[in-house]
Amino acid sequence: MEVNKLILTVKEKIEKNVITQNVIVKDKTYLHKKHSSHQPGKFHLELIIKSEELSKYNKIQATKKIYEILDDEIKNYIHSIQILIG
């Protein structure tokens, strides 16, 4: 999957499954390209999610919910994901 399509898919899935005020998805793969663990076709993403719904959960519960929503993408296209919830 191409990174821009992945970003759009991630954003749409989060917005479909969680009540959000704002979702920003950033490609941070360029920061990791020289790492020995870098795999072509696997991306490093940063998610910034403004959600009163997720803010009601503790950090672990909110992160688990995002991981459940993005299960297929994490298994197939995402090497690393940073999640910031506000």
Per-segment meaning from a language model:
Residues M1-G86:
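N-terminal, polar/charged subdomain of small-to-medium soluble alpha/beta proteins
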